[in-house]
Amino acid sequence: MSGTGSFSGTHGAAPDTRLRAKSLLIAGGGTGGHVFPAVAVAREWLARGGEGEREVVIVGTERGLEFKLVPQAGLPLELIRVAGLKGIGGVKFFRNAALLPAGLWDSAEIIRRHRFDVAFGVGGYASGPMMLLATLNSIPTVIFEPNVEPGFTNRVLANMASRVAVAHRETGVRLGRKSVVTGCPVRREFFSVPPKEHSLPFRILITGGSRGAAPINRAVVASLDLLAPRKNQLFVVHQTGERDYNDVRVAYAQREFHAEVVPFIENMAERFAQADLIVCRSGAITVAEVSAAGRAAIFIPFAAATDAHQMRNAQAMRAAGAARLIPQDELGPGRLTNEIFSLLDQPRRIAEMEQRARALARPRAVEDIVDLLDGLARPAGGKGVGRQ
């Protein structure tokens, strides 16, 4: 099988004296919270070597966002057959469980074809079998946990990993002595968001993620009549997702709000820079972006998030004085309106939340993770001996 640092030949052939590329396996995916850190780490890994000196392979599934986002980033993607088991039952559980042997086979084949020096697991379905096979093949492993509450896969993998990179100190306490606090990798443009001078109109960015969040969309629409008496003090940018776009757009227009309603936002960092307040979910990446940009936020955690990790993320930010929190089951028009007006009337409180949010950011998260991987990686400078 051909590949970097490999050779084929017959008895008596001269040995291959080329130096083998230092190779990183990144496993996992599913949501943006898995894929964006994977891409950021892959790019930093490659940037530390000259042409041909380093390589990376990202492994995921065809169901996750990685299937689209990794190739768009110009990075190699390999797929395994695996699906989730936690929180499901009935026929779907047995159907997904039946994929486990295939997923382990696919993982073993990928390990066989490549000569990885270190492996990085970002969580998600593909992370489990790939990191297990990496461990069984004596490849040093690092798993990454971006949430305050560790996910199921990472709780299992932490016992066998060489190191655990965590975004929060309290997570490190839970996962033990192998933990290293690195922070959460965030795109550079969020750290470039400057402090905002606050003036009217008060600019609110509302987003439930790239696909939108129906509960947030419904709550905002239900709040518009209560917000209307002060609508001339407000400018709203609302990312709805495709499904609710038209209904939400019409609701703002009927009440003559100053608003920009869009199904999707391409340059989110630019929108963060314009915002005085962000109303959003509290996934790990979103929370890290809010911190990096130094913005005040009202977090509305996704109620069905696995292990309630979004609630724990939001609670940590609230405890630090960096955000407000509205549980989804309390998300009525009165509560949302009161929170918005409270912050509109307290610019000093907004400024304090911004300072505290920015203080939680870790600008070197990507570099620190790659430092950790470099320190654990098996020496890659030896002669290529082929991939067996």
Predicted regions and their residues:
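Nucleotide-sugar donor-binding and catalytic loop/hinge architecture
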Residues: G5-K22, V70, E189-I206, A213
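Conserved nucleotide-sugar phosphate-binding/catalytic loop shared by glycosyltransferases and other
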Residues: A13-P15, A21-G29, G52-A102, E242-D244, ...
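Active-site-proximal region of nucleotide-activated glycan assembly enzymes
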Residues: E55, L65, T135-P195
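Donor-nucleotide binding loops and adjacent catalytic segments primarily
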Residues: G64, L69-A73, P195-I278, M311-Q315, ...
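Glycosyltransferases and closely related glycan-assembly transferases
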Residues: D106-F120, A126-V142, R155-N159
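Acidic donor-binding loop of glycosyltransferase active sites
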Residues: F116-V118, A273-A288, R295-A296
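A short, well-ordered alpha-helix in the C-terminal region of glycosyltransferases
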Residues: R349-P363
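C-terminal alpha-helical cap of glycosyltransferases
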Residues: R362-Q388
